[in-house]
Amino acid sequence: MNMILTFGTVVLGIVAFIVVLGIIILVHEGGHFLFARKYGILCREFSFGMGPQLVHHKKGETDYSIRAFPIGGFCAIAGEEAEDNPLKDSKQVRLVIENGIIQKICFEIDSKLFKDIPLFDLKEYDLFDKEDTGKLYMTVVDANGGEMTLPVDKAASYLFHSKMYKKQEIKDSKTYKKYAKEFQIAPHNRTLNAKKKGQRVMVMVGGPMMNFILAIIVFFLSALIGGVSNTTVTTLSEVSNGTPAYEAGLREDYELESFTFRGNEYTLENWEDISSTIDKYAEGNDYVDIVIKYTDAAGEEQTTSLKPMVAIYSVSMYQDINSDEVKVAELDSSSKAYKAGVRTGDIITKVNGEDVSTWLDVYHSFEQVTDEGVSVTMDVTRDGESVDDISVIPYSKDLFEKTQAVSYVDLIIGISPSVTHNLWKSLGDGFTKMYTSIKSMIFTLGLLIGSNEVGVKDLSGPVGIFSMTSSAAQRGIAYLLYWLGFLSVNIGFINLLPIPALDGGRILFVIIEAIRKKAVSEKAQTIAINVTYYALLALIVYVTFNDVLRIVK
């Protein structure tokens, strides 16, 4: 049974990963495609997936395709990369001429696939028309020695055979269609670089812009399905098993009325009251019960009590609520606490040389460590023996609270506010989450550049994203939609960075051109793009390797 569940979880993760990344990349490339089409730029192919084509359908001048590997996709925009000249070293060509106008140009003259197409000696040609005269032509000599200059259709195509072709004899049109491929020529006025600076920028911005729009939509849908927190009342949503609140008997739809501790009763009218009262509890030193007065789902007034659970998020260390000792709950091997030498089941006896008798003492000790690079020393008892001087460096308060949306140290009861399903609140939540996601990305980027706390080793690659997507899928459609939106914001933001291989780099080239009054040379652009592309590829390999190591450990 467990094997079936595990298999089902893996399949769910794979499907969710493909769907989530597929949607994000399809929307991103769709943004480029829409603006390119708007400005009259040739888009030869719009593809979902990478690798060999599985199916395709040509509509107009664009080939819409689905490829073998459903990760990624692309929009082939003419002029985005340097255009190759297939006729560069050609002395002969085969031409399909209709009504005196060249429609197809074949440079693979020895291929049996095209042996029935007339062969010409090539004298001169212009298929680019850099001056935008509107005239494309080829001067050729036929088999009888007659020289002629023929116009070339602006939508003419190069003919070539697919990689699958093995020099077979072509016996019917079906076989020809299977192996013959076409590649439409791109006159200068149909290429990206021929367009105005603002138009070029919009084509590049189009992808990230669509990612941001997608994020707002899915954040909105996530809030509409999962609900928006209703913090104006003290009614509870689902209470998670294993939390202090659950163990104390609190359940969904119960309404909290008051907290009492250390001789004081605090009336609760909204969620802000709950938060501020927990803050008051944290200010004290004695780890006492909180007596909670509440109204249950049947409308009966009840009383229960609990001790908040301590979470030291800055090192990912948590209280074992099933023990009366200062016992550490199960640790993740990737946590700072584990890497420093703390283990599940350790009983903490000292922090920074001071005796601790409760988890609230531990809370206060770590609460004081707010700055980057400050170490905390712990003594623990493990299996009856002392293990002293375990040194751990927590994440700073600033880093943690700006990137994780939770406090670096916290007292957890295990409750959350009830939710409301409201159209306008959900829409507002979509924009709010979009803003906070971008703000988090900007702050994280700043940390990568100017902080020692976060480095390349902390980034996640495809394997890490797969793992997190799988976890999101298991939490339900609302959370998966939120995760899709968060990833979409990330991809949109990253693509706007001024790195030549990314959209932001192409925008940077346009800005440099506007300042210099002269375009960056194609050669310089190509070198910069290739160098940064391979650097990014190396980075992906490195973070993927780290992802795998984390999973193995």
Where are the regions that the model predicts?
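Final/C-terminal transmembrane alpha-helix of multipass membrane proteins
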Residues: 529-547
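Alpha-helical transmembrane signal-anchor/signal-peptide segments
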Residues: 36-44, 227-244
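PDZ/PDZ-like peptide-tail recognition elements
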Residues: 199-237, 272-333, 338, 379, ...
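Functional transmembrane alpha-helices
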Residues: 2-4, 175-198, 313-339, 344-347, ...
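Juxtamembrane transmembrane-helix termini
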Residues: 35, 226-229, 261-264, 450, ...
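Small-residue-rich helix-interface/hinge motifs
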Residues: 9-101, 106-183, 487-516
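Pore domain of cation channels
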Residues: 202-215, 482-496, 502
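Conserved PDZ fold ligand-binding element
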Residues: 246-272, 339-360, 528
